[in-house]
């Protein structure tokens, strides 16, 4: 469904049945798309929300803090000053079964905001319809990247390598810092690891794709299931770390 979002599709809080409810508990399923929007401040964007089920649902929409942990997993946080500059209309929806609605996200520019990307999330949280029993509150989110105009800085750096053995495979975790002010997408072939021994390239690995938010650091994972053991040199190659630089290389000494 055109990139329907199920971010943080979770979890939610079990809720008791409403006293006196005469019907079976409602089974909820909501969807939203796109999963990620980039909004230049000041400006506006549209989020589509759908209720594919037969039961009506009430949805509250509100901006919240958002970040990625070191492994790229989404985490919610307290709404910062920029979240106060974001408005969602309507912020409460009574959505009939098998129907959809459009939400408008509007952002104003904060005078003190730094140029570049600032990630938030618009949380869509279900509520109990009046007189109905509900097994759980469902929460999903749409990532909203608020882009403040100004000088764009793109700068990635490889800052470290960690090696861990997991049963029959070896996990390489490359620490990459986004020192720029815009989000970066690290596609699978943008980061390569070469395992070098005795002057020869013994294996080539590619990092798992992930996003790095502006001004953050994260780990890019690559897995090796071969039989190479002993001391090695791992050459990490990152393509396009900054304008004017095609590749960045760092070498690390490890033992498998």
Protein language model features and the residues they cover:
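Surface-exposed binding patches on compact interaction domains or structured appendages
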Residues: 23-34, 52-102, 187-202
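Beta-sheet-dominated interaction scaffolds and their linkers
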Residues: 23-56, 92, 155-167, 173
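Short, solvent-exposed loop/turn segments enriched in Ser/Thr/Gly
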Residues: 31, 40-46, 99-103, 113-121, ...
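Beta-strand-rich interaction surfaces with strong enrichment in secreted/lumenal proteins
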Residues: 35, 89-95, 161, 206-212, ...
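Short proline/glycine- and polar residue-rich coil/turn motifs
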Residues: 39, 93-101, 209-218, 244, ...
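Exposed aromatic-hydrophobic patches
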Residues: 46, 102-104, 219-225
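Short solvent-exposed strand-capping/beta-turn motif centered on an Asx-Ser/Thr pair
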Residues: 48-55, 66-68, 177-184, 227, ...
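Terminal connector regions
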Residues: 55, 62-66, 108-151, 227-256
């Amino acid at each position: 469904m055109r990139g329907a979002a199920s971010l943080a599709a979770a979890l939610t809080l079990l809720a008791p049945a409403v006293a006196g409810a005469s019907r079976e508990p409602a089974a909820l399923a909501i969807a939203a798309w796109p999963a990620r929007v980039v909004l230049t401040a000041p400006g506006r964007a549209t989020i589509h929300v759908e209720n594919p089920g037969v039961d009506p649902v009430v949805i509250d929409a509100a901006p919240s803090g958002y970040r990625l942990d070191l492994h790229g997993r989404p985490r919610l946080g307290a709404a910062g000053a920029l979240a106060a500059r974001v408005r969602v209309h309507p912020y409460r929806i009574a959505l009939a079964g098998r129907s959809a609605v459009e939400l408008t996200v509007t952002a104003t520019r904060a005078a003190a905001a730094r140029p570049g990307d600032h990630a938030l999330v618009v949380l869509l949280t279900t509520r109990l319809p009046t007189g109905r029993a509900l097994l759980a509150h469902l929460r999903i989110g749409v990532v909203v990247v608020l882009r403040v105009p100004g000088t764009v800085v793109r700068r990635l750096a490889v800052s470290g390598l960690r090696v861990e053995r997991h049963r029959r495979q070896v996990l390489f975790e490359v620490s990459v810092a986004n020192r720029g002010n815009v989000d970066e997408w690290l596609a699978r072939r943008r980061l390569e690891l070469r395992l070098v021994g005795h002057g020869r390239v013994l294996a080539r690995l590619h990092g798992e794709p992930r996003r790095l938010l502006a001004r953050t650091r994260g780990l890019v994972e690559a897995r090796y299931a071969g039989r190479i053991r002993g001391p090695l040199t791992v050459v990490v190659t990152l393509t396009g770390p900054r304008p004017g630089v095609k590749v960045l290389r760092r070498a690390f000494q490890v033992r498998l």
